[in-house]
Amino acid sequence: MKRRVVISGLGVVSPIGNDKEELWNSIENGKCGIDEITLFDTSEHKVKLAAEIKDLDFEKYYNKRDLKFNDRFVKFARIATKQAFEDSNLQDFDRDRTGVILASGIGGIETISNCENVLNEKGPSRVSPYFIPMALINIAAGTVAIDLDARGYCSSVVTACAAATNAIGEGFLKIRDGYLDIVVAGGSEASITSLAVAGFASMRALSESTDKNRASIPFDKERNGFVMGEGSAVLVLEELEHALKRNAKIYAEVVGYGNSCDANHITAPLSDGSGAGKAMLNAISDAGIEAKDIGYINAHGTSTPLNDKSETLAIKYAFGENFKDVLVSSTKSATGHLLGASGAVEALITTLALKNSYIPATLNLNEIDEECDLNIVKNKGLEKNIKYAMSNSLGFGGHNASIILKKWED
């Protein structure tokens, strides 16, 4: 018999809030976290805007020495995990039945860039012995596992911008199928560096707008690229009976997970949206419900011309003639695109949307593109009680992932 899986803890470091309360207040008040880049000199870059982490007190969570040999993306992951675990109030638990699955799209690119500079300026003997372990994508999961003494399972998912949704989905399966009782799942990213921004800009993937309110505009007729974000979100997934036995606070239930691969192009989605549509259908089937049961979709919605059109077709593929019945929004309009961490932040937002009976808006949306003719929640959130919600993530390489969450009612 398949076991049920619930969310019992939430932690987040994001451009619109450095804990779940601050983030949710920003969502309700329509705050956008996009501003001028301060992490590096943009004078030679066409891209001037990003969604950076602001006012994060790292030493509130760990002393300076503890974080000395952590890349920025690992610091974010450790802080989000600490928040989530404290929120879950897990104290006496079986470490051998506890796992960690954390995603990242790029990992320690800040460390890579810094050490490349040292190599070029001072020679190979001056490259830090900590360079490799600081840069590895899996080191966030490994470090968090050490922090928690979680010995049951530890893994990283690297599927570009679908990674964190895959991580949550894989954690869900590990618990549902009886391998683990607790999984710390999510993602972390810190790629607002000169090199990463230059690379994405060369692909013409980033918006070059200098107006922070018109840069990340998913589904808008004038959208022209995404805005880079950074941060981390972590969900504590727990087997239902395990959670009930200890009177845990339950935010929502994870009921379905689906994925697929376009097998089409290294960066472009299938033009008809069928790949992402199949991931949604797989999640719906896995949840044992029908498409009409879903009240809200937190879309991948990157604000690129290709993605938003393709995802619109994908939603139509999965929901058929009733596609207008489901509410859709992209919270990347507020957070920017956190790449491999985006699915975790958006799953956390979707969880709180279910709990608080409030649908987040797509901000700064002036004119909906006729090719994105969905039932989009525009500019102002909507108070609505829904039972099921879906969160989508799509990544370079043709990776498509969807999870379905169910409102928890005592």
Q: Which residues make up each language-model segment?
A:
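ACP-dependent fatty acid/polyketide chain-elongation machinery
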Residues: M1-D66, E241-E253, L348-T362, K406-D410
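Condensing-enzyme catalytic core mediating Claisen C-C bond formation in acyl metabolism
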Residues: R4-S8, K31-D35, D211-A287, G295-Y296, ...
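Conserved beta-ketoacyl condensing-enzyme motif
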Residues: I7, K31-T159, S188-V197, D293-N307
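Conserved small-residue
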Residues: G9, I27, T81, V100, ...
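A glycine- and small-aliphatic-rich helix-loop capping segment at beta-alpha/alpha-beta transitions
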Residues: E21-E28, E110-P124, K174-D177, V197-T210, ...
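Active-site-adjacent elements of ketosynthase-type condensing enzymes
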Residues: E44-E52, G107-T111, A190-S216, G258-K278, ...
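Active-site-proximal alpha-helical scaffold in enzymes
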Residues: A77-D87, I137-A140, A145-A150, C154-E189, ...
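Glycine-/small-residue-rich "gating" segment that lines the acyl/pantetheine channel
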Residues: K122-S128, G169, L173, E189-K245, ...
